[in-house]
Amino acid sequence: MRIAISGASGYIGQHLSSFLEGKGYDVIPLGRDLFKEDCFDELCRCVESCEVVINLAGASINKRWTEAYKQELYDSRICVTRQLVHAINTRSVKLELFISASAVGYYPAFGEYDEYHDCRGMDFLARLCGAWEEEASACSSDVSLVITRFGVVLSEDGGALKEMLRLQRFSRVSVVIGNGQQ
């Protein structure tokens, strides 16, 4: 089975690609260049050759959110997803599965929520996640769609925890990680 992955060079994408390849799947990374305006035909060819497409593309939220960077966060998620969905919807053969990332930032900042709550927050991140999911939902109704709402990635070798540990090592700033029972 061939699986195309946008965001394959990111932290989650690298680990997922390695895992899938270890299970014998043929992973096709969809690099940034494929999402340039003049590369749509090539993107379509890549998507056409796969049974599954996984969309993990998106600039890191672990930077200062200037207005320019907010636009980059938006473009790297919404524009990429829009192009992927367009490529999926123009396929000659139905795609089996489209998995598209989102984030728990979709929910309001306070309260307890799970995947059955349709209560979207009002801040920038919630609006971004909502727009991201709406783009993915424009996928043809005959394609199985899964939207995953990721939390903050915590790992010593990448993700947010690596940066937190670096700050703790080189400054007097300390981060206390809860036990998960808060």
Describe the function of each predicted region:
Residues 6, 53-57, 98-104, 148-150:
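SDR active-site strand-loop-helix element
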Residues 82-123:
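Conserved Rossmann-fold NAD(P)-dependent oxidoreductase catalytic core, especially the SDR/UDP-sugar
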Residues 121-147:
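Active-site Tyr-X1-5-Lys
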